[in-house]
Amino acid sequence: VAGEMEQQYEALAEQGKTPLFFVRDGHPMGIIAVADAIKEDSAQAIAELQHMGIDVYMITGDNEKTAQAIAKQAGVTHVIAGVLPDGKEAVIRRLKTEGRVAMVGDGINDAPALTRADLGIAIGAGADVAIDAADVVLMKSRLTDVSAAIRLGRATLRNIHENLFWAFFYNIICIPLAAGFY
């Protein structure tokens, strides 16, 4: 029976499900599996972020097989599995040594990592503590809004840089020219 349950465990985990065993007096009685359904726009959101040149990581407490199966469905290539709730913040700290990091989360366990990231993005339907910890709150639960928010931020920054250029140009060139004519 143990061998059969082990095979069932492996099969369920490879499907992105978390197997749970029922045990009575130390003997396995059965196995069921639970699974989170990925958001229907996950694959599109991941593809958009990757097209923007952003490396996407999935940081999860799920076991490696379950995490890999979910990542495959969503199109994520970098998976860090088996992370305890306190560990997400440490992972973000490590990733920050490689460059700028944005973190998207919706739960209580995500709050420290959202705070640690250069940009914390909370899903609006998430826990209040995650929303309070984030820099940006997505009002809807659409993951495609993450790439839209990043595009908006980049466009805003580009506009600021252009305005600063013209302000300095005016102050350095035009004001002395105007002063010379009086």
Give, region by region, the residue ranges found by the protein language model:
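Conserved ATP-binding TGD loop and adjacent catalytic N/P-domain core of P-type ATPases
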Residues: 8, 12-18, 22-162
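Helix-interface capping motifs at the ends of transmembrane segments in multi-pass membrane proteins
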Residues: 165-182
